[in-house]
Amino acid sequence: MQTNELLSKIEENIAKVMIGKREVTRLMLASLAAGGHVLLEDVPGTGKTVLAKSLAKSMGCGFERVQFTPDLLPSDVTGLSFFNQAKGAFTFKEGPVFTNILLADEINRATPRTQSSLLECMAEGQVTVDGETRVLEPPFFVIATQNPVETIGCFPLPEAQLDRFLMKINMGGMSADEERELIDRFIHAEPLSQLGEVCTAEDIRQLQKACREVFMHDDLRNYIVSLVQATRKNRLSAGAGWQGVSPRGTLAFLRAAQGYALVEGRDYIVPEDIKTVAVPVLCHRLIGELEEAQKESLVNGLLNSVELPTEDWKKR
């Protein structure tokens, strides 16, 4: 199956359930293609979990869901070794991370210790328990949902954990027309339960392989570097403790642009791909005292201020 056909099929399948969330869906598909992970944030009831489930049901892959709570332990996520009396030896019981798609629901309701249990899984695609490392089968895609930190009973994700997410996406609200359509679609049915598979795990592996081959013009590479460098030069205006985007963030920016180009049906990157993924990729990597809206304003300002040459972006 061609990559553009595959992504279109998944997008249309998700649209049977999700209303008015096309751009959110496309960003999530770009992250999947790029081999990254996604953090969905918004207040309760905006469709974060439904979107994650819709993607999982669209793919013929293993799926696990973990409801993060304050009493959840790291071993509840990664698995644990226990003494098997029948065998007279220790046996490893796999945790829910041993799957293809992991929904970490309300991740910021768990303690930082439990949140950190996902660090190695997300960064390296492996789990180490009791000194033994086990490799996770690709594709491995974490979709985490979280409520805003102002919500009671939440633990803000540490910076190292945030940096493991390729994108942080806000769900956004619904228009009156979209809300009426929501009622019409769900009044006599449950579309999510009727959603079928449109691809396989092997399709996703081939998609991620194709993403690495997406072409980027040298001028666009320089454009990304200039944008990232600019985030590190705003210390005075951004306040104390300011940190710009890390080198890992630079690579994430590249991968996200490659993924979005595939979603758009191209095998090369154009400036619009970079601009579209800039806020979801960069904002959660900016460490400082600024509010979320201020970070978005800063990134959008950089997009407008950094010079972008005009070229034939397909030319190799």
Please provide the spans of the model-predicted regions.
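P-loop (Walker A) phosphate-binding loop of NTP-binding proteins
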Residues: V43, V77, T145
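Canonical AAA+ ATPase core
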Residues: N84-A89, A110, T114, M122-A201, ...
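Pre-Walker A (pre-P-loop) alpha-helix and adjacent loop at the N terminus of AAA/AAA+ ATPase modules
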Residues: Q2-V43
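Walker A/P-loop
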Residues: L32-T69
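Conserved alpha-helical scaffold flanking the Walker A/P-loop in AAA+ ATPase domains
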Residues: R26-A30, F83-L103
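AAA+/P-loop NTPase substrate/partner-engagement loops
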Residues: S58-A86
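C-terminal engagement/docking regions of AAA+ P-loop ATPases
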Residues: K233-R316
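Walker B catalytic acidic pair
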Residues: D42, D105-E106, S117
